[in-house]
C-alpha cells in the first residue's frame, strides 16, 4: 500500500499558513492525492487544488500551473529526491510502498548466492533498500549500492539518470532493481550494459529485463538510421520547467546544418505523435526535453533523444555509433 507522508504536508501548512495550496503526483497515486487534497480542504479550511496533469518527475512539477492558480505552496508527491524543498514554495513529499519483499528476496538469494550485485530502486521502495541489502548479504549475496549524485540518493535511479548504477558497473555481475518498473530497470540495463533483473514483490518473481532492454535499443538504433536519410529536421525544445534545454537544441541545430541539413526549431509542452502530425515537410525530429519520450513511445517519424541524436551525428560523419545509451545520464 502506498503511504504518503501526510504529516510533513500538514506541518508545512501549519508553519507557513498558506492561503491556498496545490498538489500533484504520478498517475498511479493520483486518486490518493485527490483524497488528500479534500482532506486538506476540510481540515485546514483552505483551497487545495489537485493538479491532474501528468507529472513525470522533478523535471515536470507543473509549478506554472500552481502559479496560475496563485497557490502559495505546491506539494509534489511521490518523486523522492535529496532536495526536500525544490524551490522556495515547492515541497517534495515522499510516497512509499510498504509491501514486504521477504518472499521474493528468498528467490533472489537462490539465484544470486555467491554473486556480486548492484542493488537499485526508485522513489517508492527507497526506504527498503538497506534492509533488503542486509538480508541478501546475510544469505551469501555480495551487495553493492552505488552513491547518489545531484538529486539522486544512494541506490536511487530516475528514468534518465543512473549514476548509482553506472559508477559500480564494472564491480558487479548483475543489477537488481527493487519494484515493478520495466521503465527504470530497462534504463539501468542499457546504461550499464549488464544483466538486469527486477525483484517484483507483487508478482513474487525475479524477472530479467535484459532482452527487453536490447529490443528497446534495436528499435532506437533503427530510428537513428531512418533519421539519417532525412534532409529536414525539427529540433524540439520542451517547455516544461525542467526540460528547457535550449543550448542543447541550438547545438544540434548548428551541427545538423554543418552536415547540410535544414532545421526547424520547435517548442512543445507535450511532445506527442498527434502534435507532430500537424507539422509539414519534416523528415525526422530530435527532442531534448526527456529521453524517455523517444524510447517509450511510438511516432510516425523518427523522434530521437539526445543520446540518439549524438549517434546520428556520428552516422552522418561516417563514424561508429557505439553503445550510445551506456551513459550516466541521457540528457
Regions from the language model: what does each represent?
Residues 8-19, 108-117, 224-233:
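Glycine-rich phosphate/diphosphate-binding loops that line cofactor/substrate pockets in enzymes
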Amino acid at each position: 500500500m502506498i503511504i504518503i507522508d501526510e504529516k510533513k504536508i500538514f506541518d508545512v501548512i501549519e508553519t507557513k499558513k498558506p492561503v491556498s495550496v496545490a498538489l500533484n503526483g504520478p498517475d498511479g497515486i493520483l486518486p490518493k492525492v485527490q483524497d488528500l487534497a479534500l482532506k486538506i480542504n476540510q481540515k485546514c479550511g483552505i483551497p487545495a487544488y489537485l493538479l491532474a496533469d501528468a507529472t513525470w518527475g522533478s523535471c515536470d512539477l507543473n509549478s506554472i500551473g500552481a502559479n496560475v492558480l496563485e497557490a502559495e505552496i505546491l506539494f509534489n508527491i511521490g518523486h523522492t529526491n535529496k532536495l526536500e524543498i525544490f524551490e522556495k514554495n515547492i515541497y517534495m513529499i515522499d510516497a512509499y510502498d510498504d509491501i514486504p519483499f521477504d518472499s521474493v528476496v528468498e528467490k533472489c538469494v537462490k539465484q544470486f548466492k555467491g554473486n556480486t550485485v548492484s542493488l537499485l530502486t526508485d522513489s517508492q521502495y527507497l526506504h527498503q533498500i538497506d534492509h533488503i541489502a542486509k538480508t541478501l548479504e546475510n544469505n551469501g549475496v555480495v551487495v553493492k549500492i552505488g552513491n547518489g549524485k545531484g538529486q539522486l540518493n544512494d541506490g536511487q535511479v530516475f528514468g534518465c539518470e543512473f549514476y548509482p548504477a553506472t559508477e559500480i558497473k564494472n564491480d558487479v555481475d548483475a543489477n537488481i532493481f527493487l519494484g515493478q518498473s520495466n521503465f527504470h530497470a530497462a534504463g539501468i540495463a542499457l546504461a550499464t550494459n549488464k544483466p538486469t533483473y527486477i525483484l517484483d514483490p507483487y508478482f513474487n518473481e525475479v524477472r530479467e529485463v535484459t532482452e527487453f532492454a536490447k529490443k528497446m535499443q534495436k528499435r532506437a538504433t533503427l530510428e537513428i538510421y531512418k533519421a539519417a536519410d532525412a534532409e529536414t529536421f525539427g529540433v524540439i525544445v520542451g517547455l516544461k520547467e525542467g526540460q528547457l534545454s535550449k543550448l542543447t537544441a541550438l547545438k544540434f541545430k548548428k551541427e545538423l546544418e554543418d552536415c547540410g541539413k535544414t532545421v526547424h526549431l520547435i517548442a512543445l509542452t507535450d511532445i506527442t505523435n498527434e502534435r507532430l502530425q500537424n507539422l509539414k515537410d519534416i523528415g525526422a525530429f530530435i527532442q531534448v526535453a526527456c529521453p524517455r519520450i523517444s524510447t517509450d513511445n511510438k511516432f510516425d517519424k523518427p523522434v530521437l533523444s539526445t543520446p540518439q541524436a549524438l549517434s546520428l551525428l556520428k552516422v552522418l560523419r561516417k563514424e561508429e555509433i557505439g553503445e550510445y545509451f551506456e551513459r550516466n545520464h541521457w540528457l
